[in-house]
């Protein structure tokens, strides 16, 4: 049984109206002083761990008593978590620190269903909590021989720059379905019940400007990164996504790419470095670069709908604020783009709060995604199947003994539906994480009313003629593995060949880019791909655009004939500086009889597969 530590916070209510104090978050105009005093409930003589698995803090905020419940975030670090920095002469130094007994927690306020908390308990209490809809920050005061802490509202931190700060993503990514109206985006409990968690293994990179900004203090940088990712992890839990930090690299000697204020250039360079360098050294799903330089007119930029892509599963974030919460929200926003989420429109909502995917940072940073964001994220996951986030790190990669009640199915558990108060699974005993008597299953696509679905029940629909439907076996709650027809098998009446469960043909790609009444262009249009200019090429090698050979022209930029009303464009193409790959002919597309596109070449099907 987990021993609970009860810590009483004695609050000297000195609100200091009209005065100010300089804290880590900046200049604060209105704050309260608290003095933490631990009152332990451990038996006399018991060995107290350095950082408990669960704690409660009792404190007063604005004169009212509150109880803060905290649980250690055991999904924060991976088992093979590594840290890399560089010696003055450029040597790579990689270590694997012991992070089992860390001091980073998530939490909530008792009797406040909408409350959240993200707290570091390493040296006092530092972080944020939301109480009755308002965001509070807490941090220890740096006074000798004192346990004093400051508690203050985010709104009372002076903002140095009141100019509107924007995300650099300007073009929406189109999913397979049009965005539904807000009234159609209700996420039901039944939908949530069968949405399995996804796991993003995150790698952070810190540039030289950040090192200079922090006077070369690498430990200070590391601590800040831990606190930021702890908050990102908290934010994504409500999207049924766990974010685990698998690595941190600090460019302590020099930048490994040229970091420029032009965000598009820097993002492209970082993506290329990740693909050619970082991925060869460390397995991960997504990489984010934090920089202390001022990006031109933006505070972040990321590729959209790119999670798991070797180059484009990346984002860049400006270290815009001293408040970790603000930077964490920016990181969650840019990673949201990687997960297929666009900026929110006017009909998107997250209750009475601002939403994370607003194009600009809100006056008070939100920790909530909108209904639109939830739909777009899971639409991307279910339709595009970014496979790298399917693997569950727990048990092998994430340091975490089984914990009943954390909503993760771990070794020795038959089910895990959360705490007894929150469990909505009628098949599962929340107190023991065992199935209730008479239940065969508690989750899975082949589990209905706690029983295995009948043999032959469809559990995964066909997405194309290259992807047959899967059916339940009657012996398991899990749907059988997703099986595709063999790559290269003819499909769509020989207009295409199967490729990873799809039947890619140029007509469909033109439709996805431009809509109805748009078709594959005449062969003469594709000859433009022999130019090797900014749009007409077949592939990139070492950053250089390689012109197509005559036999490969249909494996470069896609050209479409637009017959829609008012249009007469026989060689319409799509090009964007932010995503040069979008608008290229997709891999596996038929380019001639018996031939398909592979790495910018038109090759025999037998050679490709």
Swiss-Prot record:
EC annotation from Swiss-Prot or TrEMBL: 3.4.24.-
Active site per UniProt: 334
Residues binding Ca(2+) 1: 201, 285, 388, 391
Lineage: Eukaryota, Metazoa, Chordata, Craniata, Vertebrata
GO cellular component terms given for this protein: extracellular region; plasma membrane
Annotated protein name in UniProt: Zinc metalloproteinase-disintegrin-like VMP-III
Keywords tagged on the record: Calcium, Cell adhesion impairing toxin, Disulfide bond, Glycoprotein, Hemostasis impairing toxin, Hydrolase, Metal-binding, Metalloprotease, Protease, Secreted, Signal, Toxin, Zinc, Zymogen
All copies of domain Peptidase M12B, residue ranges: 198-393
Family listed: Belongs to the venom metalloproteinase (M12B) family. P-III subfamily. P-IIIa sub-subfamily.
């Amino acid at each position: 049984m987990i021993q609970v530590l009860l810590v009483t916070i004695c609050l000297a209510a000195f609100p200091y109206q009209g005065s100010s104090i300089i804290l880590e978050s900046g200049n604060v105009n209105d704050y309260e002083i608290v003095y933490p005093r631990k009152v332990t409930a451990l038996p006399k003589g018991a060995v107290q761990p350095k950082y408990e698995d669960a704690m409660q803090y009792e404190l007063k905020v604005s004169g009212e008593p509150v109880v803060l419940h905290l649980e250690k975030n055991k999904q924060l670090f991976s088992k093979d978590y590594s840290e890399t920095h560089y010696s003055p002469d450029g040597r790579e130094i990689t270590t694997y620190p012991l992070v089992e007994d860390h001091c980073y927690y998530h939490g909530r306020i008792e009797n406040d269903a909408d409350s959240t908390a993200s707290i570091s308990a390493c040296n006092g209490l530092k972080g944020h909590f939301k109480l009755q809809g308002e965001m509070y920050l807490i941090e220890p005061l740096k006074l000798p021989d004192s346990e004093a802490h400051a508690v203050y509202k985010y709104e009372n931190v002076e903002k140095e720059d009141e100019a509107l700060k924007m995300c650099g993503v300007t073009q929406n990514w189109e999913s397979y379905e049009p965005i539904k109206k807000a009234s159609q985006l209700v996420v039901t409990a039944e939908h949530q019940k069968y949405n399995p968690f996804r796991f993003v293994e995150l790698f952070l990179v810190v540039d030289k400007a950040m090192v200079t900004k922090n006077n070369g203090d690498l430990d200070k940088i590391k601590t800040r990164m831990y606190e930021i990712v702890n908050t990102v992890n908290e934010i994504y839990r409500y999207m049924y996504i766990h974010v685990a930090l698998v690595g941190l690299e600090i460019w302590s000697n020099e930048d490994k790419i040229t970091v420029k204020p032009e965000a598009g250039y820097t993002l492209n360079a970082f993506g290329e470095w990740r693909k050619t360098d970082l991925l060869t050294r460390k397995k991960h799903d997504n990489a984010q670069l934090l920089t202390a330089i001022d990006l031109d007119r933006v505070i972040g930029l990321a590729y959209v709908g790119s999670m798991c892509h070797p180059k484009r599963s990346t984002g860049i974030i400006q270290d815009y604020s001293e408040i970790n919460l603000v930077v964490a929200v920016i990181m969650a926003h840019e990673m949201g783009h990687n997960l297929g989420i666009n900026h929110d429109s006017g009909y998107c909502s997250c209750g009475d709060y601002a939403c994370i995917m607003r194009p600009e940072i809100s006056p008070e940073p939100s920790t909530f995604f909108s209904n639109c964001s939830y739909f777009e994220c899971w639409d991307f996951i279910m339709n595009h199947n970014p496979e790298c986030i399917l693997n569950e790190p727990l048990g092998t990669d994430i340091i975490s003994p089984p914990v009943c009640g954390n909503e993760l199915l771990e070794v020795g558990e038959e089910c895990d539906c959360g705490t007894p108060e929150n469990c909505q699974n009628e098949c599962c005993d929340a107190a023991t994480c065992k199935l209730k008597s008479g239940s065969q299953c508690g989750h899975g696509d082949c589990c209905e009313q706690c029983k295995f679905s009948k043999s032959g029940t469809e559990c995964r629909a066909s997405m194309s003629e290259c992807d047959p439907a899967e059916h339940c076996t009657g012996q398991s709650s899990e749907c059988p593995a997703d099986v595709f027809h063999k790559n290269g098998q003819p499909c769509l009446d020989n207009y295409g060949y199967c490729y990873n469960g799809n039947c890619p043909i140029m007509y469909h790609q033109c439709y996805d880019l431009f809509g109805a009444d748009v078709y594959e262009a005449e062969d003469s249009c594709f000859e433009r791909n022999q130019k090797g200019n900014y749009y007409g090429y077949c592939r990139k090698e070492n950053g250089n655009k390689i012109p197509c050979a005559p036999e490969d022209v249909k494996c470069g930029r896609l050209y479409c004939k637009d017959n829609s009303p008012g249009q007469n464009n026989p060689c319409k193409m799509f090009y964007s500086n932010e995503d040069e790959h979008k608008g290229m002919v997709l891999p596996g597309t038929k380019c001639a009889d018996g031939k398909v596109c592979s790495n910018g070449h038109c090759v025999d099907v037998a050679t490709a597969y």
